Amino acid sequence: MLKSNKVVLIGAGGVGSSFAYALTIDNSLVHELVIIDVNENKAKGEVMDLNHGQMFLKKNINVLFGTYKDCINADIVVITAGLNQKPSETRLDLVDKNSEIFKDIITNVVSSGFDGIFVIASNPVDIMTYVTMKYSKFPIHKVIGTGTILDTSRLRYFLSDRLNVNTQNIHSYIMGEHGDSSFATWDETKIAMKPLSEYLAEGKITEIELDEIHKKVVNAAYEVIKLKGATYYAIGLGIKNIVNAIIGDQNIILPISSYINGQYGGLVKDIYIGAPAIVCKEGVKEVLNFKISPKELEKFNSSANQLKSYIDKIEF
């Protein structure tokens, strides 16, 4: 059960600050946002900057600088802290360093008495979500990662741009790792009620174009990092959607880092990976186990095995 509609953000860098900004301008439910960062001046500066815009908000939110002690009565702790991906680095290159950072963060949060829901956005997010579950010993439904929510948004944007259809009417997901081994669920994709396969049959789009769209999704982060140094606006909006789904008990389906233990063919077990799930006030209500094609199932297993190979090297 929700306690106080209070969210604690750990990490006041580009992603954390973008989430905080998105939450303040589109907030109807959160009463308090506490920001924590190892760089206390950065956190204090973000708090001041956000509070100075209160006059322009539809609903005020109490934004505060805090410490780990403030987690005790929070409903949600959002973690964006950790080292960022550099040009030419993959997200998986960050495993060792960010695992050590997380061990300290999770220990401090749990020691405060926090018993709410973790939302993880730090990369590699699927592995960091698993790390959070292991270090916190929290139930799996109370540990959520952003997963492929950003990848899915990118996919729908690129497909909507190609077909000239609003993104809200495109029903498709990116599944698997939030990274290079992800895949698009093209065989299940629909534009409103019309299967994508009919668009292909009518010659309105080609298989080659779909492959190019998926490549653009996979390479999007590298491109943005090359151009501006980091990605943060879009993922900030994605985190805000997850938080609102929890606080608002929305029962919305989101492609998050979900705990998989036998779904999708039974081969993938004990791992967090991008898959659609129902998100509500309790965290994850259900991981959807919908039917995907054999080709996509093979990609799902391959992506999971890659993540597993990194997780198995971490000492818990």
UniProtKB/Swiss-Prot annotation:
<dbReference type="InterPro" id="IPR001557">
    <property type="entry name" value="L-lactate/malate_DH"/>
</dbReference>
<comment type="subunit">
    <text>Homotetramer.</text>
</comment>
<protein>
    <recommendedName>
        <fullName>L-lactate dehydrogenase</fullName>
        <ecNumber>1.1.1.27</ecNumber>
    </recommendedName>
</protein>
<comment type="function">
    <text>Catalyzes the conversion of lactate to pyruvate.</text>
</comment>
<dbReference type="GO" id="GO:0006089">
    <property type="term" value="P:lactate metabolic process"/>
</dbReference>
<keyword id="KW-0021">Allosteric enzyme</keyword>
<feature type="binding site">
    <location>
        <position position="231"/>
    </location>
    <ligand>
        <name>substrate</name>
    </ligand>
</feature>
<dbReference type="InterPro" id="IPR015955">
    <property type="entry name" value="Lactate_DH/Glyco_Ohase_4_C"/>
</dbReference>
<feature type="active site" description="Proton acceptor">
    <location>
        <position position="178"/>
    </location>
</feature>
<feature type="binding site">
    <location>
        <begin position="151"/>
        <end position="154"/>
    </location>
    <ligand>
        <name>substrate</name>
    </ligand>
</feature>
<feature type="binding site">
    <location>
        <position position="37"/>
    </location>
    <ligand>
        <name>NAD(+)</name>
    </ligand>
</feature>
<feature type="modified residue" description="Phosphotyrosine">
    <location>
        <position position="222"/>
    </location>
</feature>
<dbReference type="GO" id="GO:0005737">
    <property type="term" value="C:cytoplasm"/>
</dbReference>
<dbReference type="InterPro" id="IPR018177">
    <property type="entry name" value="L-lactate_DH_AS"/>
</dbReference>
<dbReference type="InterPro" id="IPR022383">
    <property type="entry name" value="Lactate/malate_DH_C"/>
</dbReference>
<feature type="binding site">
    <location>
        <position position="91"/>
    </location>
    <ligand>
        <name>substrate</name>
    </ligand>
</feature>
<feature type="binding site">
    <location>
        <position position="15"/>
    </location>
    <ligand>
        <name>NAD(+)</name>
    </ligand>
</feature>
<feature type="binding site">
    <location>
        <position position="42"/>
    </location>
    <ligand>
        <name>NAD(+)</name>
    </ligand>
</feature>
<feature type="binding site">
    <location>
        <position position="156"/>
    </location>
    <ligand>
        <name>beta-D-fructose 1,6-bisphosphate</name>
    </ligand>
</feature>
<dbReference type="Pfam" id="PF00056">
    <property type="entry name" value="Ldh_1_N"/>
</dbReference>
<feature type="binding site">
    <location>
        <begin position="123"/>
        <end position="126"/>
    </location>
    <ligand>
        <name>substrate</name>
    </ligand>
</feature>
<comment type="similarity">
    <text>Belongs to the LDH/MDH superfamily. LDH family.</text>
</comment>
<keyword id="KW-0560">Oxidoreductase</keyword>
<dbReference type="GO" id="GO:0006096">
    <property type="term" value="P:glycolytic process"/>
</dbReference>
<keyword id="KW-0520">NAD</keyword>
<dbReference type="InterPro" id="IPR036291">
    <property type="entry name" value="NAD(P)-bd_dom_sf"/>
</dbReference>
<comment type="pathway">
    <text>Fermentation; pyruvate fermentation to lactate; (S)-lactate from pyruvate: step 1/1.</text>
</comment>
<dbReference type="InterPro" id="IPR011304">
    <property type="entry name" value="L-lactate_DH"/>
</dbReference>
<dbReference type="GO" id="GO:0004459">
    <property type="term" value="F:L-lactate dehydrogenase activity"/>
</dbReference>
<feature type="binding site">
    <location>
        <begin position="82"/>
        <end position="83"/>
    </location>
    <ligand>
        <name>NAD(+)</name>
    </ligand>
</feature>
<feature type="binding site">
    <location>
        <position position="68"/>
    </location>
    <ligand>
        <name>NAD(+)</name>
    </ligand>
</feature>
<feature type="binding site">
    <location>
        <position position="171"/>
    </location>
    <ligand>
        <name>beta-D-fructose 1,6-bisphosphate</name>
    </ligand>
</feature>
<dbReference type="InterPro" id="IPR001236">
    <property type="entry name" value="Lactate/malate_DH_N"/>
</dbReference>
<keyword id="KW-0963">Cytoplasm</keyword>
<dbReference type="Pfam" id="PF02866">
    <property type="entry name" value="Ldh_1_C"/>
</dbReference>
<feature type="binding site">
    <location>
        <position position="85"/>
    </location>
    <ligand>
        <name>substrate</name>
    </ligand>
</feature>
<feature type="binding site">
    <location>
        <position position="146"/>
    </location>
    <ligand>
        <name>NAD(+)</name>
    </ligand>
</feature>
<keyword id="KW-0597">Phosphoprotein</keyword>
<feature type="binding site">
    <location>
        <begin position="121"/>
        <end position="123"/>
    </location>
    <ligand>
        <name>NAD(+)</name>
    </ligand>
</feature>
